[in-house]
């Protein structure tokens, strides 16, 4: 769990990043482009701006509303479609991010602050942004980005999500959308109309509906929409593949480092209700029913909810988040695991993958012995405590199984190996093996699946070398940031970014990421019999036979069976101890009686 204090805003961005944002007052609209910057939609007209990129321009339409502001009584409710407007809407600047916790763990450190809101925060936050090639295309493929952030943070306006490079180089339309996070988006009382849960997912769905109805005037093809996201954004993409009411709103899907079946991605209705009630108690609410609880929570200012939301977690852990999607019987008719195994999902082409060190980023947020400011060499005692926090739902037997699986028993006190093992445990458990299981379930239904492992560490990465290729650090290559000369990427990294943008765009166009210009050959499909994947780095495309097959068999098959078999072991042990105590007491009583009998004077035999 992050150790940061919410409410503090990040330090100002360096001047070169501020220039990158190209605020409207700095951008001249060239003659002949003015017509491209006004678009009429079903909800009203919008006027965007022209942004310079490389040796050309793209048109950007920033801050278009797709829902009514979820203010006042609309807090915790399903979103309502935006009402039409009559004026020409100024769409030349980003809108504020949705209210969320701000990471102040390392003040002034851009490695963390690059993920913090950079446009302020508001509950009035349901807007989307569109980047369009210039000149405006006709029926271009559309890529829709859903940001990650553990369902408690994230913003569509982050610099790393700047859509101009991907739009310009690949002649695609890029859309980024906002959705409510934390308690505002995922506090759930399933069955109650006051706070049904999954509001953030419904925000996303409403944005996808707006795109279906309105992307054509921007030059996009509503029948060629690919939804993509990273981490909780990837989990969201997977959830729309599962939810029957979302499936018709897009054609293809890309999941980067996340899936709907991840252990952190959903909670049960009982757990969701328990967390909502605990938040109310933490905020001093007195309530006898759902309406009274929600009424009290609506009376609190946003920062009060943010300050207390992490207190609802039931155990000390990392890679667990306070308010997440709930299995409500509506958006989700069943658990993601059950829906995937039964084939109850949208059958389509899927591109998915992970980065090399998925766990390292999370280790510094609470595991003993870890810090970005040292080598984080981990003692055996800290390793064992780290395992317990990394698998918080596991009983002692399952925890021991994880320790057994990841320990080098010939060198168990090696602090570097203990650090690397915890990196692997957190990454395998929370990201890699859920993604592998998702890919396997899709491949079994003969859907086209393409898989990757991104294992290039950026030359300008701010995180220490021991963290390797951390969670989230393929995104800059997908969005083309290395093409910005001021960010000091190497020529090889610029080429890697160009390749990755081509892969993603080719997939959006055709359902196959293969780049015809790539001499390395075709990107193989991932099948049930041949679960192949490619490595994405500065070297030529290389195919590998399977992704952590042995270790994912442990997480996806063995450990669930072990947990199921030992689910009642603590109760059985308690009953055994109670019965043993009763038996022991009985035996002590019998022995006492027997000793007393032996001491009695007895008549001699006649």
Swiss-Prot record:
Liver and muscle contain both isoform T and isoform S. Venom gland predominantly contains isoform S. One of its GO terms (biological process) is choline metabolic process. GO terms for molecular function: acetylcholinesterase activity; toxin activity. Belongs to the type-B carboxylesterase/lipase family. Glycans are attached at residues 289, 374, 484. Keywords: Cell membrane, Disulfide bond, Glycoprotein, Hydrolase, Membrane, Neurotransmitter degradation, Secreted, Serine esterase, Signal, Synapse, Toxin. It is found in: Synapse; Secreted; Cell membrane. This is Acetylcholinesterase. Its EC number is 3.1.1.7. Inhibited by active site inhibitors: edrophonium, trimethyl-(m-acetamidopheny1)-ammonium iodide, and trimethyl-(p-acetarnidopheny1)-ammonium iodide. Inhibited by both active and peripheral site inhibitors: decamethonium, and BW284c51. Inhibited by peripheral site inhibitors: snake acetylcholinesterase fasciculin-2, propidium, gallamine, D-tubocurarine, and tacrine. Also inhibited by antibodies Elec410 and Fab410. GO terms for cellular component: extracellular space; plasma membrane; synapse; synaptic cleft. It is a peripheral membrane protein. Residues 1-28 form the signal peptide. Its main location: other. Isoform S is monomeric. Isoform T can form oligomers, including collagen-tailed forms. InterPro entries: AB_hydrolase_fold, AChE-related_enzymes, AChE_tetra, Acylcholinesterase_fish/snake, CarbesteraseB, Carboxylesterase_B_AS, Carboxylesterase_B_CS, Cholinesterase. Disulfide bonds join 98-125, 285-296, 433-552. It is an enzyme of class 3 (hydrolase). It comes from the Eukaryota. The N-terminus is blocked.
């Amino acid at each position: 769990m992050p150790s940061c204090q919410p409410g503090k805003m990040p330090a100002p961005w360096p001047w070169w990043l501020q220039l990158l944002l190209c605020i409207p007052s700095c951008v001249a609209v060239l003659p002949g482009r003015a017509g491209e910057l006004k678009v009429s939609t079903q909800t009203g007209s919008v006027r965007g701006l022209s942004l310079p990129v490389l040796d050309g321009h793209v048109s950007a339409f920033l801050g278009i509303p797709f829902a009514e502001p979820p203010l006042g009584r609309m807090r915790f409710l399903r979103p309502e479609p935006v009402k039409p407007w009559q004026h020409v809407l100024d769409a030349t600047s980003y809108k504020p991010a949705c209210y969320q916790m701000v990471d102040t763990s390392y003040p002034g450190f851009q490695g963390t602050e690059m993920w913090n809101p950079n446009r302020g925060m508001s509950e009035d936050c349901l807007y989307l942004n569109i980047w369009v090639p210039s000149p405006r295309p006709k029926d271009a493929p559309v890529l829709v980005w859903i940001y990650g952030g553990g369902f408690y943070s994230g913003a569509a306006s982050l610099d790393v999500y700047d859509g101009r490079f991907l739009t310009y180089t690949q002649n695609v339309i890029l859309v980024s959308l906002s959705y409510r996070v934390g308690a505002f988006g995922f506090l759930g009382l399933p069955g109650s109309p006051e706070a049904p849960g999954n509001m953030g997912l419904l925000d996303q769905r409403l944005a996808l509906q707006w795109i279906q109805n309105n992307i054509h005037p921007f030059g996009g093809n509503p029948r060629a929409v690919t939804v993509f996201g990273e981490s909780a954004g990837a989990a969201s993409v997977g959830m729309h593949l599962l939810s029957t009411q979302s499936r018709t709103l897009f054609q293809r899907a890309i999941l980067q480092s996340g899936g709907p079946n991840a252990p952190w991605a959903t909670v049960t209705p009982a757990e969701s209700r328990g967390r909502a009630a605990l938040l109310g108690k933490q905020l001093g609410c007195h309530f006898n029913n759902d309406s009274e609880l929600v009424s009290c929570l609506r009376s609190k200012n946003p920062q009060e909810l943010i300050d207390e939301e992490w207190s609802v977690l039931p155990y000390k852990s990392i890679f667990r988040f306070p308010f997440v999607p709930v299995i409500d019987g509506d958006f989700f008719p069943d658990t993601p695991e059950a829906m995937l195994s039964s084939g109850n999902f949208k059958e389509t082409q899927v591109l998915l993958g992970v980065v090399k060190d998925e766990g390292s980023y999370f280790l510094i947020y609470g595991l003993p012995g870890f810090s970005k400011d040292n080598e984080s060499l981990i003692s055996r005692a800290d390793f064992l405590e780290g395992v317990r926090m990394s698998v918080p739902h596991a009983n002692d037997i399952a925890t021991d199984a994880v320790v057994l699986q990841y320990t080098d028993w010939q060198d168990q006190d090696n602090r570097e190996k203990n650090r690397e093992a915890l990196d692997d445990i957190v990454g395998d458990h929370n990201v890699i093996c859920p993604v592998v299981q998702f890919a396997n379930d899709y491949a079994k239904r003969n859907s086209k699946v393409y898989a990757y492992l991104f294992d290039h560490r950026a030359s300008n990465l701010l995180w220490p070398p021991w963290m390797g290729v951390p969670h989230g650090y393929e995104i800059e290559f997908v969005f083309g940031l290395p093409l910005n000369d001021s960010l000091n990427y190497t020529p090889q990294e610029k080429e890697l970014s160009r390749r990755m943008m081509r892969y993603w765009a080719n997939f959006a166009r055709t359902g196959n990421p293969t780049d015809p210009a790539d001499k390395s050959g075709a990107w193989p499909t991932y099948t049930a019999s041949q679960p192949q994947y490619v490595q994405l780095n500065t070297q030529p495309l290389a195919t590998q036979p399977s992704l952590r097959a042995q270790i994912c068999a442990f997480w996806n098959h063995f450990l669930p069976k072990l947990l199921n078999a030992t689910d009642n072991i603590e109760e059985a042990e308690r009953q055994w101890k109670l019965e043993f105590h009763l038996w022991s007491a009985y035996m002590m009583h019998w022995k006492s009686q027997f000793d007393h009998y032996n001491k009695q004077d007895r008549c001699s035999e006649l």
